[in-house]
Amino acid sequence: MVHLTGEEKAAVTGLWSKVNVDEVGGEALGRLLVVYPWTQRFFDSFGDLSTPDAVMNNPKVKAHGKKVLNSFSEGLKNLDNLKGTFVKLSELHCDKLHVDPENFKLLGNVLVCVLAHHFGKEFTPQVQAAYQKVVAGVANALAHKYH
């Protein structure tokens, strides 16, 4: 559960309504893989991830980034029940994929950076604070199965 004020919820949903999930998703996942290269081990089937350009232009990275942000969008619709929303993804990432749950935090922080880059002055410190709460809540929900 993420505790947001009415103003914070409005800021998050208002900005999110302007997000191009295809573009931002691919960029966020791509940046995660470039900035934290050890995360690439979970994406062996994605082909060439040998250089930053290869990662950022990889169609499988872009497609999976879109999928990730579509799931994030579902979380935004269910802020009062994030653990329930992400229970199956938590089980998948824990039991089958064995993803270190710290990676969820890293991706959340990268997403915040990408949003700041895309929205500039519109991404005020107040908007950032609200998004930091949301990505922390999503990361916690995704890590729930690990506890």
From Swiss-Prot:
Matches recorded under InterPro entries: Globin, Globin-like_sf, Globin/Proto, Hemoglobin_b, Hemoglobin_oxygen_transport
PROSITE patterns the record matches: GLOBIN
GO molecular function, one term: organic acid binding
UniProt-annotated binding residues for heme b: 64, 93
Keyword Kinase: no
GO cellular component, one term: blood microparticle
This protein's UniProt keywords: Heme, Iron, Metal-binding, Oxygen transport, Transport
The Globin domain, residue ranges: 3-147
One Pfam assignment: Globin
GO biological process, one term: hydrogen peroxide catabolic process
Tissue: Red blood cells.
Domain of life the protein comes from: Eukaryota
Binding partners and assembly: Heterotetramer of two delta chains and two alpha chains.
Family: Belongs to the globin family.
Official protein name in the record: Hemoglobin subunit delta
Species of provenance: Ailuropoda melanoleuca
Gene label: HBD
